[in-house]
């Protein structure tokens, strides 16, 4: 689960991290009221959406030369003018896709005189099974670009869970970030704070980009992105209360209601598979044959006929889907049950796009017979390779 920047900063502030004074606003009147209470003279007006690249984004409703989703203002009047222009508009960034996201709230905070921009994040290091810091002196830009072009400028430090962040870890991180004086002192305090917040709140990602050194030598969290482990949210009702459903894909919300693991993608071939590994393999082979998957959808190991029907409804709700591939290995799940669900779903949704079904495992012959005897336009496949080729051919021939 993701939260907004202002929520992330509020959470980090509760742990003692240095963040600027700021307030989230939902109207022009609120913006004017609260901007007057900030010291100024420099303000930052930030669009609050669950996507990166806001500063370089553009608003659909504004001219192409208009400013992006993060703006500087040098007076309360400028703050108000920017809020009027940004609030309620659709911001398009490299992460939103061409449809963009509507800006329903803005975050107004004190500006800062920046000397240096750094990168810092915490995540789960899958290699060591530990929480790791990832730091770089190249802050304020896309870390993937840094990793691709100058990987030597990125340092990863895994933390021993039995000891936590030690003095030696702090020294290492400060050295990698070239911190000295007040900034080094702040860093030695900040690193344990961030680690504590990450672990106690069951985060999956804590990214600060940039972490800045100000002209007085002090550190400040200038931007913050936080994601939480969905499987641990039952332990954190306070965090669950921060969820903004309007920022989530409606199809993913609907899928979660039926215990379906669904992630929307940008392709045109819908996938319904049981098991995450098989789902990944299915998406890979679709790409191998020259097409793109429209989604990841794992129906799990004990899907019922009703669950399969819901899965079809979710897949077909995506207007980009031009064909569907069902790939099921029946272990716990029986192929005849899946076949019945597929037939029921095709009839209920009135499927208009090509459908390829590959079944293997428990009761596979019964499952194939159900599909073949249905009289519906369903293409049967013998194996995964055959299935991928058939759905790609069907979509490209449509």
Curated annotation (Swiss-Prot):
Its annotated pathway reads: Carbohydrate metabolism; tricarboxylic acid cycle; succinate from succinyl-CoA (ligase route): step 1/1
Required cofactor(s):
Mg(2+)
Residues binding substrate, per UniProt: 274, 331-333
Q: Name one GO cellular component term.
A: cytosol
Positions binding Mg(2+) in this chain are 209, 223
In the record, biological process GO terms are: succinyl-CoA metabolic process; tricarboxylic acid cycle
Gene3D superfamilies according to UniProt: ATP-grasp fold, A domain, ATP-grasp fold, B domain, Succinyl-CoA synthetase domains
What family does this belong to? Belongs to the succinate/malate CoA ligase beta subunit family.
Q: What does this protein do?
A: Succinyl-CoA synthetase functions in the citric acid cycle (TCA), coupling the hydrolysis of succinyl-CoA to the synthesis of either ATP or GTP and thus represents the only step of substrate-level phosphorylation in the TCA. The beta subunit provides nucleotide specificity of the enzyme and binds the substrate succinate, while the binding sites for coenzyme A and phosphate are found in the alpha subunit.
Its protein name is: Succinate--CoA ligase [ADP-forming] subunit beta
Q: Which organism is it from?
A: Bartonella bacilliformis (strain ATCC 35685 / KC583 / Herrer 020/F12,63)
Q: Which gene encodes it?
A: sucC
């Amino acid at each position: 689960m993701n939260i907004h920047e202002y929520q992330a900063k509020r959470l980090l502030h509760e742990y003692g991290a240095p963040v600027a004074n700021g307030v989230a606003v939902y109207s022009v009147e609120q913006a004017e009221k609260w901007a007057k209470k900030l010291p100024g003279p420099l303000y930052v007006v930030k669009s609050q959406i669950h996507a990166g690249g806001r500063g370089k984004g553009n608003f659909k409703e504004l001219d192409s030369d208009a400013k992006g989703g993060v703006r500087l203002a040098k007076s309360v009047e400028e703050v108000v003018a920017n809020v009027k222009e940004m609030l309620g508009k659709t911001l398009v960034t490299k992460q939103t896709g061409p449809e963009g996201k509507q800006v329903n709230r803005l975050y107004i905070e004190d500006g800062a005189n920046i000397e240096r921009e750094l990168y810092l994040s915490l995540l789960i290091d899958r290699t060591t099974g530990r929480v790791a810091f990832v730091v770089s002196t190249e802050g304020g830009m896309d870390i993937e670009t840094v990793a691709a072009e100058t990987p030597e400028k990125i340092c990863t430090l895994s933390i021993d869970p039995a000891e936590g962040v030690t003095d030696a870890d702090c020294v290492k991180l400060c050295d990698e970030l070239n911190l000295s004086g007040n900034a080094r002192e702040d860093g030695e305090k900040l690193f344990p704070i961030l680690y504590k917040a990450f672990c106690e709140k069951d985060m999956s990602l804590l990214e600060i980009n940039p972490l800045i050194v100000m002209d007085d030598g002090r550190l400040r969290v200038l931007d913050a992105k936080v994601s939480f482990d969905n499987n641990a949210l039952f332990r954190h009702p306070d965090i669950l209360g921060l969820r903004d459903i309007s920022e989530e894909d409606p199809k993913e919300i609907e899928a979660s209601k039926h215990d379906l693991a669904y992630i929307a993608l940008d392709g045109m071939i819908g996938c319904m598979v049981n098991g995450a590994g098989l789902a990944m393999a299915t998406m890979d082979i679709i790409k191998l044959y020259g097409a793109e998957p429209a989604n990841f959808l794992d129906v799990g190991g004990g899907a019922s006929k009703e669950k399969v029907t819901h899965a079809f409804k979710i897949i077909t709700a995506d207007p980009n889907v031009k064909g569907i591939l069902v790939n099921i290995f029946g272990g716990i799940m029986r192929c005849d049950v899946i076949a019945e669900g597929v037939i029921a779903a095709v009839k209920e949704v009135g499927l208009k796009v090509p459908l390829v079904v590959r079944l293997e495992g428990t009761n596979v012959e019964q499952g194939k017979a159900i599909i073949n005897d249905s009289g519906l336009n369903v293409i049967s496949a013998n194996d995964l390779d055959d299935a991928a080729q058939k759905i790609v051919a069907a979509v490209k021939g449509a």
